[in-house]
Amino acid sequence: MTDISPVRVAAVQAAACPFDTNRAVEMVCSMTAEAAKEGSRLILFPEAYVGGYPWGLAFGTAVGGRSEVGRRVFGRYWESAIDVPGPEVERMCQVAGDFGVWLCVGVIERDSTYSTGTLFCTLLYFGPNGELLGKHRKLKPTAAERLIWGEGDGSTLTTVETDFGRVGGLICWENYMPLARMTMYGKGVKIYLAPTADSRDRWQSTLQHIALEGRCFVLGCNQYVHRSMYPNDLEISEELDAWPETLSAGGTAIYGPLGEVLGEPLWNQAGIVYADLDMGAIHRSRFDFDVTGHYARPDVFSLIVDESAKHSVE
């Protein structure tokens, strides 16, 4: 770490653009520009922002059956996903390079190399040099997410070294997996990213716990989603009728390494949460607790992580 001045970071609570990938990419570009002009050096967007998190949709499924209309809607969702690399990725590379920022964006990724049907919930890392530096695929989709997303493997437990410290993180309820969190801590993450689709109040306790446990800064980031944001011509839109008008109230927030609130949670609107991080607070906070250092017991506990890529056919 060579830069000891405060580091401004931004967590973007963007309004959802379901089934409208081009608009989502343009939102990434415009809100990145806004955050960069405010001095942000690291900018985080929510889980599944580009490609969409389909709140409230069941895609016409029930135990033991699927519907033709559900298949059509999944086809439309698949078309909303992006290839990595691909033209949408190139556009986000460009905006990161134009503004010289570290940019992290949640996307829905198509796997066109090994499968033409499987989607992944992915976090992309872009550098200020305008390059895609890496990606993380969600290891375990939650509940009905398993219907539409595949599972990532250990090869994308990505972290990125910046000039102000190592950045990495996990997506949504992966953050309830203790061994996954420990893997991030073991990689030396100082700024921990936790993009999510969970807008419950209690999610704030999770973010605060991660900050205290890892003695790291934590950026929690969610979308603001209203039923009216879905396209009018969406088939099976009646599946949304059982849900409230506001599908995700947000809750984007930033916490410090002693669990202190640095960026208050933002609710019921789109916006950007900022914080200025004193990176020296990391080692000061670890004076009495260092989860992979003096508070670890490798003689009692060990964690083995398989970071190899897994394919159905070798």
PLM region descriptions:
Residues 223-314:
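C-terminal beta-strand edge segments of enzyme domains
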Residues 1-42:
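N-terminal glycine-/serine-/threonine-rich phosphate-binding loop
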Residues 105-107, 121-125, 158, 220, ...:
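Short beta-strand scaffold segments in enzyme catalytic cores
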Residues 10-12, 44, 104, 134, ...:
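Hydrophobic/aromatic beta-strand patches that form the interior of the parallel beta-sheet core
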Residues 21, 33-128, 198-200, 204-216:
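Cys-nucleophile CN-hydrolase/nitrilase-fold catalytic domain and related Cys-dependent amidase chemistry
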Residues 51, 58, 124, 136-140, ...:
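Short beta->alpha transition motifs characteristic of CBS
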